Amino acid sequence: MRKTHYIPVTADVPGAASDANCALISRTIRTALAAEGVTAPCEVDVLLTDDEGIHRINLDMRQVDRPTDVLSFPEFDLAPGEHPGPEDADPGTGLIPLGDMVLSMERVAAQAKEFGHSRRRELAYLVTHSVLHLLGYDHLDEGPMKEQMRAREEAVMALLGLER
């Protein structure tokens, strides 16, 4: 039984799963989970792809016919700030399967350029954003829920030393 988070990162584009990217993704997920008070060992599966790959997944899973920067597929229907409990752990591994995230590395590069910051910061931001979705946060409205999610994202980015 694992006592730490398990974060497998796979890629279907060459070079995306570099040691540096995998280390940043793992550190970001661990930091975001800790910031949200998640102490039980969790599994988060990460796929790094390109615009074509994420477009295909977006169409298949959400019937949205366009690429996006990040997709999150939570295992649980949680309210913001709610955590799955030990009873949700896989009996074989002892891990709580939080869900999956898919990131377009093309969007990471384009958005980093657009927003005038590093790819490293953009990747960490999108990973943080996805973790919060896995934990029940959302931003469908332009009101308090979106503000709450943005505040949590900025808090995690500050912990990572990657604030704006």
Residue ranges of predicted features:
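An acidic/histidine-cluster motif and surrounding catalytic segment
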Residues: 1-124, 132-164
